Amino acid sequence: MKKRAGIITILTAVLLMFTGISAFGLPLAAPDKAEREVAAPEDADEWIRILLGDHPEELEEQWKLTDQMKLAATMSGGMKGIADSLAALGTIETIGSAYQGEVQGFQAFFIPCVFSAASVDLILVTDQGAVAGLTTGPYTNAPENEEQAEGFETVELAVPVPDLNGELPGTLTLPEGEGPFPAVVLVHGSGPNDRDETLMNLKPFRDLAEGLAENGIAVYRYDKRTYVYGAQMVNDIQATLMDETVEDAVAAVQILAQQERIDPSRIFVLGHSLGGNAVPAIDQALKDRETAACGYILLAASPRPLGELMRQQYDYLYSLMPEVTQEQQEEKDALFRELDRLQDPDSLADDDMIAGAYAPYWKWLADYDVLHMAEEMEKPCLLLQGEEDYQVTMEDFRIWQDALKDKANWQLISYPGLTHLFTAGEKTEGPKAYLRTEKVDDKVIRDIAGFIKK
């Protein structure tokens, strides 16, 4: 089976695998042959019922799993560990009938589930009949128009993607009134994110859009290129962060500036996580096109090399495990040996794949001096950090503080009690904090709104 590539995961894989939710996009090796397949909705129904039943370990013994899913299970304490990771949702009350769909070009099955604390769809992603990933999504049996927010309106607006002869669907959220309004473009973190940056029960970009619109600021968010065109991009060996993130953010700024109710002189760019890391590159790309944003907001952005960040995340998540088996330690050692190759990216052939991304992706990042470029930025910049973030930590925040301490155009704020998604949680929860039903903290929205309105 052909390997499936890379830029559609990276940090997302680090996050999701430790909740028992394997990212689909990393290389997937051929599964064992003498095992059952998930090929139809009734298979998915049975698989989920076993997972949530008394003997989830049967899934490892009887059903096909890709190597990546096996790794996720190993690092989660087996399928029982995966089932336990869903405990934050409460006890299972109802399992609905599965229906078939597609995620990133992979066959997927959506199973509506009602738990005592929340209702979600469990999404089972398959590759040639083998289970390749498990994640959560919005509950599809939820009543429409439930708790609709007020005080703004939404308009569908797509970002053109000429090199793929397509577009990225998006939503422009507008305050009430005629405008022209200040506006902000939201730029996703790593992984194949939708316009809401949905992760488990959280939708931080939707929260930001609605919260800022209520403060008189328009917000433009769009589905990420790897979310819409993941199947086309998996074999693009030459793809870099420019293709994955930067060029589309620039196009979004340009299309937003053309909207009648938007003030083109007051457009800001907000990047989260890897999107925040990309902000200096976005600023330079806008300058190269003889345009500019009015200012920039970076949320949970790391100034450190991505490989180093991945290593730290794995170390931390392993530390949360009550016991590390020999097999789990061997898996970790193998991953770290792979990450060690990033210390000499020039030695990599273009078709070498490290942690789910081809060598050109890593070579571009190795040449990207984010701290130096940030120091050279002239526009007002706001950098925000959650103090309970285990993915991008206060160590990263202190690096920014030291590098930017003499830069009058930079403002840095950290928030006690907030996670990587700026929702309430504790670092010691790890990814289980994202199973909570939370929204982006109001203080974060107020601080962003105040910065934009200055």
Please describe what each predicted stretch is.
Residues 285, 295-376:
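Accessory cap/linker subdomain of secreted extracellular hydrolases
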Residues 189-244, 315-318, 424-434:
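Cap/lid segment of the alpha/beta-hydrolase catalytic domain
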Residues 255-317:
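Primarily recognizes the serine-hydrolase "nucleophile elbow" in alpha/beta-hydrolase
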Residues 421, 427-454:
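Catalytic active-site module of serine/aspartate enzymes centered on a nucleophile-bearing elbow/loop
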Residues 180-189:
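Short beta-strand element of the alpha/beta-hydrolase
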Residues 238-260:
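Alpha/beta-hydrolase active-site loop
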Residues 139-178:
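N-terminal cap/lid segment of alpha/beta-hydrolase-fold proteins
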Residues 377, 383-385:
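Short beta-strand/loop motif that positions the catalytic acidic residue
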